[in-house]
């Protein structure tokens, strides 16, 4: 599910994707529920978690429209229910495929997963997501993250390309299946205390929510007179664009980001079944 995270300098509440404690899970669950309820009750308003943020964003866009200008923003999308082991450690990684799809959306200028650029300010001891065994397996399941009950559904399947297990095996599929059977008894109890990586490690899903943030640029077609060049005369020229202009396309791109993430993950799930 996606929401408008920011328009210009106006920010909505961010998804609580990183805290995987019982409290953090409940916060994310409540955010998703609130977002769904607001979207159904107010389909013509901006898709935000915080109603006040939607009002402030709308006013910000109106200001840009009156100035014959445009604004950009960011969109956050969290994908719950993604099983562990989807993707690969090289060019077919989950992040690779998602980024490729998301950059195919016009006006997308940035894509980051998990903490993204925020990870550059963290130490490894802060960013690394610690694993543990759940004291109570039932606590790892909630409706906001359907796969927590199957959290590392085949934890070793995520390591199916591990040379230590496949090096002398001529049937990698059988090897992966054997690892699944061996790990099934205990893998369901493995949980992550945090999710700074955004649900993907080494290109492979961890079973935690996949979190991605997308940056949308301001629309270039604006009412202002802009400096350009005349290639016929080889001289500077003024560019005037007439007609109606979108002051902001972020709200409309929100559902596109959500759809692209869903299609990409579904494609990868189908590939896993082949």
Language model features with spans:
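Glycine-rich anion/phosphate-binding loop at the beta-strand->alpha-helix junction
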Residues: 67-142, 167, 171-236
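Predominant activation on well-ordered alpha-helical scaffold segments within soluble catalytic domains
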Residues: 55-58, 96-103, 211-213, 254-267
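Internal helix-turn-beta structural module
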Residues: 219-274
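Short alpha-helical "patches" and their helix-cap loops
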Residues: 1-7, 116, 270-274
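Short, mixed-charge aromatic SLiMs
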Residues: 6-17, 124-127, 234-239
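Generic recognition of cysteine residues
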Residues: 40, 47, 77-79, 100, ...
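Glycine-rich, mobile lid/loop segments that gate access to catalytic sites or pores
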Residues: 1-90
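Compositionally biased, intrinsically disordered low-complexity segments enriched
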Residues: 135-169
């Amino acid at each position: 599910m996606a929401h408008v995270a920011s328009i210009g300098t106006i920010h909505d509440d961010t998804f609580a994707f990183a805290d995987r404690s019982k409290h953090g899970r409940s916060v994310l669950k409540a955010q998703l529920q609130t977002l769904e309820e607001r979207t159904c009750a107010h389909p013509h308003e901006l898709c935000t978690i915080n109603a006040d943020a939607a009002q402030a964003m709308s006013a910000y866009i109106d200001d840009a429209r009156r100035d014959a200008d445009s604004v950009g923003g960011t969109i956050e999308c969290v994908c719950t229910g993604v099983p562990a082991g989807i993707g690969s450690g090289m060019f077919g990684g989950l992040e690779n495929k998602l980024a490729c799809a998301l950059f195919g959306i016009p006006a997308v200028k940035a894509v980051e997963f998990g903490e993204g650029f925020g990870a550059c300010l963290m130490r490894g001891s802060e960013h690394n997501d610690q694993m543990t065994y759940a004291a109570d397996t039932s606590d790892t399941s909630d409706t906001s993250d359907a796969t927590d009950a199957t959290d590392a559904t085949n934890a070793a399947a995520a390591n199916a390309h591990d040379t230590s297990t496949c090096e002398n095996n001529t049937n990698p599929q059988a090897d992966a299946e054997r690892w699944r059977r061996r790990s099934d008894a205990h893998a369901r109890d493995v949980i992550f205390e945090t999710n700074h990586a955004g649900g993907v490690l080494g290109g492979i899903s961890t079973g935690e929510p996949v979190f991605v943030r997308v940056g949308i640029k301001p629309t270039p077609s604006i009412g202002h007179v802009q400096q350009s060049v005349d290639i016929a005369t080889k001289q500077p020229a003024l560019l005037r664009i007439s007609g109606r202009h979108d002051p902001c396309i972020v709200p409309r791109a929100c559902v596109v980001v959500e759809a692209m993430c869903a299609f990409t993950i579904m494609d990868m799930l189908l590939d896993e079944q082949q």
